[in-house]
Amino acid sequence: MQLRLSSGNVLNEKVHKVGIIALGSFLENHGAVLPIDTDIKIASYIALKASILTGAKFLGVVIPSTEYEYVKHGIHNKPEEVYSYMRFLINEGKKIGVEKFLIVNCHGGNILVESFLKDLEYEFDIKVEMINITFTHASTEEVSVGYIIGIAKADEETLKEHNNFEKYPEVGMVGLKEARENNKAIDKEAKVVKRFGVKLDKKLGEKILNNAIEKVVEKIKEMIR
């Protein structure tokens, strides 16, 4: 069957060889404002939007996620389980002509799987790249992006509740003592959140989201040059 590769809103015919995969987390507490699957919803939104704008193939989401052992705010998997699912998606993607894979990751803990990317490239003789778009956990940036894509309940009362760090210790990781003790970057971010609190900034959310989508679009353009 001869496929009409130039049809539709696509950058060019080469873009059909690029596949986009969303990577995040489905089971994490995000305070009162955001749902437990915030990370994968943001990753999926960005990945799908970039796919629509370029014509690259959106291949779906990775269901498992992983996390540093000292960060306890959800239910996660071993890095090997994430790798196994990525391997499945890449194997299926290759069957439909994808040769270059771009993973859009919006969960910090998943950075642990980056070491497996070369293994995937070697096994399947393909190119794999990963873009990490992460935020201070359940803080102003993530709340604002979540609001723009429609997943945040950010009325005044809920935001006030969200800023109760004793009830929601995962917000900014302010109350996650073990995580703060083991990671200086987490501790630094937590201090900022505790001092200034979490707010809704619609303009900031729009700016971050648009910049993230543009970053993925530019990477896709780079991959088909």
Swiss-Prot record:
Gene Ontology terms, MF aspect: 2-amino-5-formylamino-6-(5-phosphoribosylamino)pyrimidin-4(3H)-one formate-lyase activity; ferrous iron binding; hydrolase activity, acting on carbon-nitrogen (but not peptide) bonds, in linear amides; protein homodimerization activity
Reactions this protein catalyses: 2-amino-5-formylamino-6-(5-phospho-D-ribosylamino)pyrimidin-4(3H)-one + H2O = 2,5-diamino-6-(1-D-ribosylamino)pyrimidin-4(3H)-one 5'-phosphate + formate + H(+)
Protein's pathway: Cofactor biosynthesis; coenzyme F420 biosynthesis; Cofactor biosynthesis; riboflavin biosynthesis
One Pfam family hit: Creatininase
Cofactors, names only: Fe(2+); Zn(2+)
pH dependence: Optimum pH is 7-8. Has approximately 80% maximal activity at pH 6.5 and 40% activity at pH 8.5.
Coiled coil location: none
TM region positions: none
Single GO BP term: riboflavin biosynthetic process
Cofactor mode of binding and number, as noted: Requires one Fe(2+) ion for activity. Requires an additional second metal ion that could be Fe(2+) or Zn(2+).
Broad enzyme group: hydrolase
Chain residues that bind Fe cation 1: 28, 39, 107
Annotated InterPro entries: Creatininase-like_sf, Creatininase/forma_Hydrolase, FAPy_deformylase
Residues the entry annotates as binding Fe cation 2: 30, 39
SUPFAM superfamilies: Creatininase
Alphabetic keyword roster: Hydrolase, Iron, Metal-binding, Zinc
EC number: 3.5.1.102
Subunit comment: Homodimer.
HAMAP family: FAPy_deform (MF_02116)
Described purpose of this protein according to its UniProt entry: Catalyzes the hydrolysis of the formamide of 2-amino-5-formylamino-6-ribosylamino-4(3H)-pyrimidinone 5'-monophosphate (FAPy) to form 2,5-diamino-6-ribosylamino-4(3H)-pyrimidinone 5'-phosphate (APy).
Family per record: Belongs to the creatininase superfamily. FAPy deformylase family.
Full protein name: 2-amino-5-formylamino-6-ribosylaminopyrimidin-4(3H)-one 5'-monophosphate deformylase
